[in-house]
Design a protein with these regions (language model features):
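Extracellular glycoside hydrolase catalytic/binding regions
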Residues: 37-145
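Exoplasmic/lumenal beta-rich domain surfaces
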Residues: 234-274
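Exposed beta-strand face motif in extracellular beta-rich ectodomains
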Residues: 280-284
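C-terminal edge beta-strand
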Residues: 297-305
């Protein structure tokens, strides 16, 4: 319940504001009147209990009536917006849609799986960690630094390791704690100073031939990984079954199993892989790390041709 939570956390200095609902707009158009009345009623109650902290309501992007409904909610002070690929145009779209209240970019990161065109068997190509780091910078520059007086700040997603769609899509760290390039970018943007040692840089993987192969076929994939300081970079390759769950809604998922013995050659400039005999989608991952806690990732979707049998 909201009342006990407000009374409990009114005084701790770590509390910045009160978030009244996350992506609770209801209906595709975001105009469910019952939900918006409830949001405003709760916000009004919170303001009476704690007049020293502002209230915020978070919406998934800006579509439909979301801007108007937050603007009309008299007890809501701040519009929280979760935006990924759309962060580059967020400030412009917010103003054009009639947004007047200050906003917080409450979730941002690389383009979401739902925003990436899928290949011909339905698998989304994932940007490299280097490409994602560049996108974090652009998103922050456009949606936060590019909107002074309107944007109050932001929260990156996800500060940790997470299996969602793939083992590496959203996490800014690997499971062993190694930091990816996005951490270096945000460290610089937040502090004004880049880390003295940067994470490795990786180019998109290149499949020699076609990524759609016969069962048991061998496949060579090329890579290019460099260390900004010129140091040594260690690499490892893993072939995993594809999860196939691309719209998980944020729920935690187990990491798909590694195909043992699939990687025949593992080098910094590429890998030779023997694909499984079982038909279906797979994904080949490259992990690169330096000696200073930095890492880079890239992957490519692959397909073994044939009829995929569904377990009975």
């Amino acid at each position: 319940p909201a009342r006990p939570a407000v009374l409990r956390y009114t005084d701790p200095p770590a509390v910045l504001l009160w978030g009244i609902g996350n992506e609770r707009a209801g209906f595709e158009a975001g105009d469910n009147p019952a939900i918006w009345k409830a949001v405003n009623d709760v916000a009004a109650m919170v303001k009476k209990l704690d007049p020293n902290h502002p209230t915020m309501c978070v919406t998934a992007e800006l579509g439909g009536a979301r801007i108007a409904r937050v603007r009309e909610a008299s007890a809501i002070d701040i519009h929280g917006i979760n935006s990924y690929g759309g962060a580059l145009s967020l400030a412009e779209r917010y103003r054009a849609g009639g947004g007047t209240k200050p906003y917080v970019l409450t979730e941002f990161g690389p383009p979401g799986v739902w925003e990436i065109p899928k290949n011909d068997w339905g698998a989304p190509p994932e940007p490299t960690s280097t490409e994602k780091a560049a996108f974090y910078r652009r998103a922050y520059d456009e949606a936060v630094r590019g909107a002074p007086g309107l944007a109050l700040g932001s929260y990156v997603f996800a500060w940790g390791h997470k299996m969602e769609a793939t083992a590496t899509w959203y996490g800014m760290f690997l499971s062993d704690g190694a930091r990816l390039g996005a951490v270096d970018v945000m460290t610089e943007l937040w502090s004004g100073r880049a880390p003295s040692n940067l994470a490795p840089v990786v180019e998109p993987l290149v499949v020699q031939g076609t990524p759609r192969v016969d069962p048991g076929a061998e496949l060579r994939v090329l890579a290019q990984v460099t260390d900004p300081e010129g140091g040594a970079v260690r690499v490892r390759w893993e072939l995993r079954s594809e999860s196939g769950e691309y719209n998980t809604g944020g729920d935690a998922r187990p990491v798909p199993p590694t195909v043992e013995g699939a990687v025949l050659e593992s080098r910094g400039d590429g890998a030779l892989v023997r694909m499984p005999r079982d038909p279906g989608p797979y994904r080949l991952f490259l992990y690169a790390d330096d000696a200073d806690g930095g890492a880079a990732t890239a992957n490519v979707p692959l397909l073994v041709k044939g009829e995929v049998r569904t377990p009975m």
